[in-house]
A protein has these predicted regions:
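Active-site metal-binding loops of divalent metal-dependent hydrolases
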Residues: 129, 154-159, 186-188, 222-223, ...
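Short acidic, glycine-rich surface-loop motifs adjacent to enzyme active sites
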Residues: 185, 189, 299-316
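Acidic, histidine-bearing metal-coordination/catalytic regions of metal-dependent phosphoesterases
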Residues: 19-153, 174-177, 384, 390-453
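Bacterial N-terminal signal peptides
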Residues: 4-14
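Conserved, compact domain cores that house catalytic/ligand-binding motifs in diverse enzymes
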Residues: 149-219, 224-225
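Extended active-site neighborhood of metal-dependent phosphoesterases/phosphodiesterases
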Residues: 111-113, 122-138, 198-300, 319, ...
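Acidic/histidine-rich helix-loop elements
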Residues: 82-109, 152-167, 190-192, 234-237, ...
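Active-site-proximal beta-strand elements of phosphoester/diester hydrolases
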Residues: 148-158, 268-278, 305-309, 356-363, ...
């Protein structure tokens, strides 16, 4: 009798463990929001608050936020930050409100542009809701061109943002507590699955205080678009409704991609954001190239970065973005751009060539596999690795580091401006971990062309 009970108990325990293991290894959904649950409905309290640089980040910035539709043309209040809780009499800026209807209901997205600020000054600001206000946030305007600058660069976040992007953002903030600017290389969300607003809610939740502590400059990815008239002769890419209202970006882009291209100056750096999806799928590559030529040609600063979602040199098998190389690459080489920051391919790879330095990185959970070509032409490369990048500019030296989700150094180099000799790349190998490769034959969904999803 006792033996029978013992066998039954052991079998029951094994069954329970097996059930737990089976549950633990199921593919994780893109969001943590269960079906039928409304997690990110708009309210009278301001949320999704994000600051972005003005064209001249020394004298201004812009803020976007969301409320329910009871709030229209709310205020942003701003003062020079001080140590007293008495904020004094603030300057008030009236926002422009735009209606957006989603699976979470109707919302008003607001934009306030703040100009006329003093360089290298810490400002406190807050945004208005329905009979309430946000917390006071701090933003320091850009300093003189000779001042040091630390910034962050993230590859695609896209999937499972709260679950797995959160830890990378936290690690990045720990490693770069003095960062003032954050660049995102597109595909911030996945989209196209009927819960776009949930995904944007998760993106903001995953980024926690970063969007109100730094100024944020994103590039649009293909997942910020959707397919209209899919599987018909009229099929075309259309920019998703969230993008134009979620961020308050400079309005200086090319006419053919006005909402998705822009440039700005931050100290001794000019950043130009191009739209790879529009260039490749909507035929704007030539127009973007002419605009890029002007934006880079008028750059008075020592440093320049071009950011785009799709890579010029793809590290993933089966991808080849010919139109980017045909129209835009000659402009980048003509103006001796220092860095080209990219995403899209869900691996890490740095092209083995003199400047411009072409980098592809990934922050989120989706992980692809490297092509044989990438293994030959790029170094270092990585699969199955979540990363963030820290860039530090000080005088004639740009210091670049790529770190893993746990903070380990993966890639590092310096670009040194030697005046008449141009910019020289200096490898920094000390402290780097070994290259990482995917050891799984397939994903939990059975896809052999990916490492994780």
């Amino acid at each position: 009798m006792r033996q029978g009970l013992l066998v039954a108990l052991l079998l029951g325990t094994c069954a329970a463990v097996s059930a737990q293991e089976a549950t633990a290894r199921r593919p994780e959904p893109n969001t943590r929001v269960p079906k039928g649950v409304q997690r990110y409905a708009p309210t009278g309290f301001p949320d999704r608050i994000v600051a972005s640089p003005a064209q001249d980040a020394a004298t201004g910035f812009s803020v976007a936020w969301r409320t329910d539709t009871k709030v229209d043309a709310p205020l942003l209040e701003i003062v020079v930050a001080g140590d007293s809780p008495d904020m004094g009499e603030p300057r008030r800026v009236t926002a422009i409100s735009t209606l957006l209807k989603t699976e979470n209901g109707s919302a008003h997205h607001h934009r306030a542009d703040v100009d006329g600020l003093q360089p290298d000054t810490l400002y406190a600001w807050r945004v208005q809701g329905d009979r309430t206000w946000s917390a006071w946030h701090h933003t320091r305007t850009a300093a003189a061109t000779t001042s040091p600058l630390t910034m962050l660069y993230f590859g695609d976040t896209q999937n499972k943002n709260v679950s797995l992007t959160t830890r990378v953002v936290r690690e990045a903030m720990r490693h770069a507590p003095d960062a003032k600017l954050a660049l995102y290389a597109g595909d911030l969300v996945s989209g196209g699955d009927g819960e776009d607003d949930n995904e944007w809610g998760e993106w903001f939740e995953a980024n926690e205080v970063l969007p109100t502590s730094l100024v944020v400059a994103p590039a649009p990815g293909n997942h910020e678009y959707f397919e209209e008239f899919e599987d018909t002769p009229q099929e075309r890419r259309v920019l998703g409704a969230h993008w134009p209202v979620t961020f308050a970006l400079p309005g200086n882009g090319v006419a053919q991609a006005k909402k998705t291209t822009y440039w700005f100056d931050y100290q001794d750096l000019r950043v130009v954001v191009i739209d790879g999806t529009s260039a490749l799928d909507l035929g704007t590559a030539k127009a973007q190239a002419a605009w890029l030529d002007q934006a880079l040609g008028s750059n008075p600063h020592r440093w320049s970065i071009v950011m785009t979602h799709q890579p010029f040199f793809s590290p993933r098998e089966g991808r080849d973005n010919v139109a980017l190389r045909k129209h835009l690459l000659p402009v980048i080489r003509k103006h001796n751009v220092d860095l080209v920051l990219q995403g899209h391919d869900h691996v890490y790879g740095r092209l083995k060539s003199p400047p411009p330095v072409f980098v592809v990185s990934v922050t989120g959970a989706k992980q692809y596999r490297l092509s044989d070509e990438a293994r030959r032409t790029m170094r270092p490369v990585a699969e199955d690795t979540q990363l963030f990048q820290v860039l530090h500019f000080e005088g004639p030296r740009l210091r670049y580091e790529a770190r893993t989700a746990t903070g380990r150094l993966y890639d590092a180099f310096d670009l040194v401006d030697e005046g008449g000799k141009g910019k020289q790349l200096v490898e920094r190998t000390e402290g780097r971990i070994d290259e990482r490769a995917c050891t799984r034959a397939e994903t939990l969904k059975g896809r052999a062309d990916r490492c994780w999803e």
